Amino acid sequence: MVTQILGAMESQVGGGPAGPALPNGPLLGTNGATDDSKTNLIVNYLPQNMTQDEFKSLFGSIGDIESCKLVRDKITGQSLGYGFVNYSDPNDADKAINTLNGLKLQTKTIKVSYARPSSASIRDANLYVSGLPKTMSQKEMEQLFSQYGRIITSRILVDQVTGVSRGVGFIRFDKRIEAEEAIKGLNGQKPLGAAEPITVKFANNPSQKTGQALLTHLYQSSARRYAGPLHHQTQRFRLDNLLNMAYGVKSPLSLIARFSPIAIDGMSGLAGVGLSGGAAGAGWCIFVYNLSPEADESVLWQLFGPFGAVTNVKVIRDFTTNKCKGFGFVTMTNYDEAAMAIASLNGYRLGERVLQVSFKTSKQHKA
């Protein structure tokens, strides 16, 4: 496939940059970039059978790559059709956009753009939908909501055993105003084939007031506990990470900052104390993968607490080193809240790691 890709490049880009890519896709980019994001690209509409090596080979032909990741489904391992590339040189990133944007690969026309920084107009555009007919497909749900704006991602939650829809879904729009219009138009309405009205509301992100309270607590805690040369850097990491969680802000620091045990320690006061690490009790058990070796239980409390009642968290540690083995478990009492947490945190970037979050199955690691 690599040979075919390079051949396609030669035939398509000889006359200059290709035309615009298709208008809809899983994630967003921007035609411009801030000084801190001129090396980080998002690539949409990749062929599903494209491998990580082929993805790296394609973009590595432009210049030196710091990192690249083809995003895959956490369960099936199949490509989700998009990925991220971070170049060493901003000029190479710009060249990749001019050279590869609009490149046709198999039946796809790829879109290459700068990873879009957050802004008020695009934040919090994720909707939670309940009461959907069990027979409604993801495509039908998208058709229902597409009249209100551009849909970025959609998902219908299914039973892990039977594969049957739970009647709960998520829709992420391009802009918040589109999500607001969808709520006005569809909340309380009966779609075709529905016996009951559906509920459409914003996914349960922490409110601005809650976020501000967290920030205040965090700064007070850090001021008491840390001083010296590390204080400012640690404080900045905490602020960035908390903003990322509370407001959906994806600032450059969160993309490159290493996961710091010092920073996490400062968050422990926000999550409560007296955590026990035994087996999960009654409720919905969530599997969290790709945690840092330095991660502890306070990380999981801090991540999942804003979505609802958490009864237990557990980080699985190596017996010899006492370091996190890369995964842990969270138990939440309410299914809808657990589902919202999964939909919001799966793919969440924590430090340099992208978390994989799903309902626990028998195939996954056991505590």
UniProtKB/Swiss-Prot annotation:
What keywords sit in the KW lines? Developmental protein, Differentiation, Neurogenesis, Repeat, RNA-binding
A single GO cellular-component term on record: ribonucleoprotein complex
Please name the GO terms that the record assigns under molecular function: mRNA 3'-UTR AU-rich region binding
Q: Which residues form the signal peptide?
A: none
Q: Which residues form the RRM domain?
A: 39-117, 125-205, 284-362
Q: Does Repeat show up as a keyword for this record? A: yes
- Give the tissue specificity: Brain specific.
One matching Pfam family, short form?
A: RRM_1
Q: Which GO terms describe its biological process?
A: cell differentiation; nervous system development
Q: Which family does it belong to?
A: Belongs to the RRM elav family.
Domain-related comment: RRM 1 and RRM 2 bind cooperatively to AU-rich sequences in target mRNAs. RRM 3 binds to poly-A mRNA sequences.
Subunit comment for this entry?
Interacts with MAP1B light chain LC1.
Q: What PANTHER family does its record include?
A: EUKARYOTIC TRANSLATION INITIATION FACTOR 3 SUBUNIT G (PTHR10352)
Please explain the role this protein plays, according to its UniProt record.
RNA-binding protein that binds to AU-rich element (ARE) sequences of target mRNAs, including VEGF mRNA. May also bind poly-A tracts via RRM 3. May be involved in neuronal differentiation and maintenance. Plays a role in the stabilization of GAP43 mRNA and in spatial learning.
Q: What is this protein called?
A: ELAV-like protein 3
Q: Which gene encodes it?
A: ELAVL3
